[in-house]
């Protein structure tokens, strides 16, 4: 006969309670970690802002106000702005050399320090649609990034090294590629949210990275350009008055979902690269501190400095070892030392040389220093 559950049953819910507690604890831990990360980023940003000079803080404030005004204007006049974009894209599409012009612009922004790759990518989607726009953008970006890589590898190598050393992320990822320049690692790196043109120049400074591997990685990661094409294509459709509000709402949601998915994907890939970098640190392949790689010139006058005495070196710059402590118990060494002392005293009596007890030099080889000596040495004269 089945037993009915009761409040006195000690086994009721025995398995469910620990599982529930474990799930809640893990969820709470994840939430706390994310909140700590957000607070940490905010505090780091604030500390960085306060460490800047007055003119730079003023410039940042002006840029922040300008961006806020632009956002407000877009929210108010978004319909007129989208319609203007549609008109411009239609005129561009009607140009005889429109495709060549867009190809040239995308090709050129592959060379650092030029910017504007994202805007041109969305423009390709607005003007030429999803499929045609992606083909044009992929060809221009792959060829532009590869040519930029070759130019900075063979003609502007010193400039490429400066670009790599100017960014902490570039330095970290370059150390990974120096140890493992496989195609898989480079593909993950190309999917990370790094500046497009700057990464082309910085990666050229890594001699272990083959040009063919770089070209293949750019080719394999070209489908990610569909995100920019899709967003640009949907932005143009928002300006089409023939479509209903429900269609516009779907377009807006699709843009938001696409952007969120792309951000999440790049965030996950970036975290994977950070964990791989940490793995290299744990194995000791890559030094954890940049000061180990590039040198640390701070605290030159710290207490860790070793104070050397010139009397500790002979004329050939070899350190004179102190053997007194090691051979103090050796009978042969003690007898030999006594003979040297007696011989030196006999020579002194005969006037062959004169011993100065205040010059800080152990003339007899006894390892004892005069109390009035200002030098601390175990060296002796060689006659």
Curated annotation (Swiss-Prot):
Signal peptide start and end residues: none
Keywords carried by this UniProt record: Golgi apparatus, Membrane, Transmembrane, Transmembrane helix
Lumenal side: 1-57, 121-133, 234-248
Recorded topology in the membrane: Multi-pass membrane protein
Disordered as annotated region, ranges: 1-22, 345-383
Pfam family of the protein (one): VTT_dom
Keyword Cytoplasm: no
Superkingdom of source: Eukaryota
Record's compositionally biased regions (Polar residues): 1-10, 370-383
GO cellular component: Golgi membrane
Chain residue ranges for the region called VTT domain: 125-235
TM ranges: 58-78, 100-120, 134-156, 214-233, 249-269
GO terms classed as biological process: mitotic spindle elongation; vesicle-mediated transport
Keyword Membrane attached: yes
Cytoplasmic side: 79-99, 157-213, 270-383
PANTHER family to which the protein is assigned, alphabetical: GOLGI APPARATUS MEMBRANE PROTEIN TVP38, GOLGI APPARATUS MEMBRANE PROTEIN TVP38-RELATED
Role summary: Golgi membrane protein involved in vesicular trafficking and spindle migration.
Name this protein carries in UniProt: Golgi apparatus membrane protein TVP38
Taxonomic lineage: Eukaryota, Fungi, Dikarya, Ascomycota, Saccharomycotina
Underlying gene: TVP38
